[in-house]
Amino acid sequence: MGPGSGQAHTQRGARVTSAERRAALEVIAAEVTACTRGRLHSGRTKAVPGEGHMDTEVVFVGEAPGMNEDRAGRPFVGRAGDLLVRMLDTVSWKRDEVFITNVVKCRPPDNRDPEPDEIEACLPYLQRQLAVIDPPLIVTLGRHSMGRFIPGAKISQIHGTSHPVDPTTGASGAMVYAMYHPAAALRSSDVERQSFDDAAGIPAALLEARARRIGPIDVAESANGRARATEPLPLPKADHRPTPTTESITMDPAPDAPTFF
């Protein structure tokens, strides 16, 4: 069950090839690696552009790199990354089938929360990544990531729910699904339980995001015959919690699953 490429992706970006997406993401990654735009660059070991599959339908957006990410130049490594992989495992998805990035690309000192000016300095990179991948669904991890897409919301009130995305974020026509940051789940068993419950709702959120974007189609066809829905899916509401699904939501992966650093 994976959110990779397939017929559903061609519905949203038929004029953009995988090679073009790959090239565009590589350009962005190179720019992030060399970036000195924000004040965080002076204290970093490595910038963290993001990584994952160029043709995915789901992009996970965290807040900022931590110590482990700063050393590795990769998002969500260490214990938080392990927990995210476990959450993906619950819906039979693999890490390299999605794209994972952060709002801020360099580590804030002492793992503090990113400041508004630091978010603004990195924002063009996130906007371009989302515009290139053009995902139907964005999963935010943490309140600072959520705040970029749903300003003024409280994560304790809206986690596990889907919301329309403002086109100015770079993700035109997408939905956003809010979750707690895995690091918060590591600190609280209650948050961990809620996070796994929310992760179980991601496939249903993806089905609804597809339906909202491409309109009433045979969802089974869009998923290469493995998703068995035969009726048009309802459009998600702004405060809608997707109904969990037990369907296998699978699309054929691309021949390769490149990773971008």
What are the residue ranges of the model-derived segments?
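Glycine-rich, small/polar surface segments that engage phosphate groups of diverse ligands
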Residues: 67-95, 99
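Active-site and ligand/interface coordination hotspots across diverse enzymes
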Residues: 1-79, 224-261
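Short, charged beta->alpha transition segments
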Residues: 46-49, 87-88, 167
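Short, basic/glycine-rich phosphate-binding loops at helix/coil junctions
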Residues: 22, 29, 65-66, 99-111
